[in-house]
Design a protein with these regions (language model features):
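Conserved blade-register residue in beta-propeller folds
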Residues: 14, 55-57, 106
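Conserved beta-strand element within WD40/beta-propeller blades
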Residues: 45, 96-97
Length: 134
C-alpha cells in the first residue's frame, strides 16, 4: 500500500518459501481482498480505488500470475462503497466487504453478478470471513 496513497505508487509482492520478495502487480494503490479459488488456479484481487475485482490465472507451484480478467466493476454494478476485504465460500462465490457502503455482497464467480447484499448498521465494513466447525 502506498503510504501517501498516491494512485499507482504501490505494488503487490509475493514472499516465497525462501524468504525472497517478487513483484507481481505494478501500479496499484491499495491492495485488498486477495483470495484464491479451491484449486488455487485463480487469484481474486482488489485494488480498492479501482472499485474492480480482477481474476488472475495463478500457478500455485511458481506463484506466476497470468493476464487478469475483470470479474466485476462495483461502480457499474451500482453498489455503494469501495470493495475492501474479501473471502470465498465453499461454492466458489466471493463475499466482499463494502467500506463506506455498510454491506457485504456475494458475487457469483461464474457470472460476475451480485447475488446477495447484506446490509449492516455500520458504514466502515472492511472484512468478512467464515468460521465454525463446517
Amino acid at each position: 500500500m502506498s503510504t501517501t496513497k498516491q494512485t499507482g505508487d504501490a505494488s503487490l509482492y509475493m514472499l516465497d518459501h525462501e524468504g525472497c520478495l517478487h513483484k507481481k502487480i505494478d501500479h496499484v494503490t491499495n491492495s485488498n481482498g486477495i483470495c484464491w479459488n479451491a484449486t488455487a488456479s485463480l487469484m481474486y484481487y482488489i485494488d480498492t480505488p479501482t472499485k474492480k475485482v480482477l481474476a488472475y490465472p495463478f500457478d500455485n507451484t511458481t506463484g506466476n500470475l497470468g493476464a487478469p480478467t475483470e470479474l466485476i466493476d462495483i461502480e457499474t454494478a451500482g453498489i455503494e462503497g469501495s470493495p475492501d476485504g474479501m473471502t470465498i465460500d465453499v461454492d466458489g462465490n466471493l463475499w466482499i466487504a463494502m467500506c463506506h457502503g455498510g454491506a457485504v455482497i456475494q458475487v457469483d464467480t461464474q457470472t460476475g453478478k451480485v447475488v446477495k447484499k447484506i446490509s449492516f448498521p455500520c458504514v466502515e465494513t472492511t472484512a468478512c470471513t467464515f468460521g465454525g466447525a463446517h
